[in-house]
Design a protein with these regions (language model features):
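Core alpha/beta nucleotide-donor-binding catalytic domains of modification enzymes
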Residues: 1-131
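ATP/NTP-dependent adenylation/nucleotidyl-transfer catalytic domains that generate, transfer
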Residues: 121-176
Length: 176
């Protein structure tokens, strides 16, 4: 696909299970760690400034539900930050099924992390059991509603941080 669309591609092959064992983490965490390390290498090598990740609205809802179950504050209610340093997430307002439908209509294949189907991970149980239950039995638009709530909570957090920063500056003359 990259060759067909003339998009540069760099492929890394890593032993995720070995890395996980060596670093005392789950394969899910190890895969994420390795991907991020590789992304940063390519960013530097190619002189980029941002790395776009494919997190979508369903991922964000999984994060919200997981945060709620563990207890969270306003930051956790905002879900995944759309921009965090070099990391950008332009698909947070798009549902997984919309992305899959788009790809299917165009005959574009995609791959997913193999750990995504492993029910040992709580995030996967939220994805495979809780969210479908909410959509089937509570509200078919549960994901959209939670997505909009997270947007508002994220904006509220940003507003509070800005206001606190300005107040701190006015009281102390200290700038961030």
């Amino acid at each position: 696909l990259c060759r067909q669309w003339n998009v540069r591609l760099k492929v890394y092959r890593e032993n995720v299970p070995a890395y996980a064992k060596e670093h005392g983490m789950t394969e899910e965490e190890a895969g994420r760690d390795i991907r991020r390390t590789c992304f940063c290498k390519v960013l530097k090598e190619w002189g980029g400034t941002k790395i776009a990740l494919a997190h979508h609205e369903n991922d964000n809802v999984e994060t919200l539900l997981w945060n709620l179950c563990r207890g969270t504050g306003i930051r956790g209610l905002g879900g995944i930050a759309p921009v965090n340093d070099v990391w950008i997430r332009p698909l947070l307002c798009v549902k997984r099924r919309e992305i899959e439908s788009y790809l299917k209509k165009r005959g574009i294949s995609y791959c997913t992390d193999t750990t995504n189907a492993d029910r040992r991970y709580m995030r996967n149980r939220i994805r495979m059991d809780v969210i479908p239950y909410l959509e089937d039995c509570v509200n078919t638009e549960s994901v959209s509603h939670m997505g909009k709530t997270m947007e508002r909570m994220y904006e509220l957090e940003q507003y509070i941080l800005e206001e606190v920063g300005q107040y701190k500056e006015s009281c102390t003359g200290w700038k961030n």
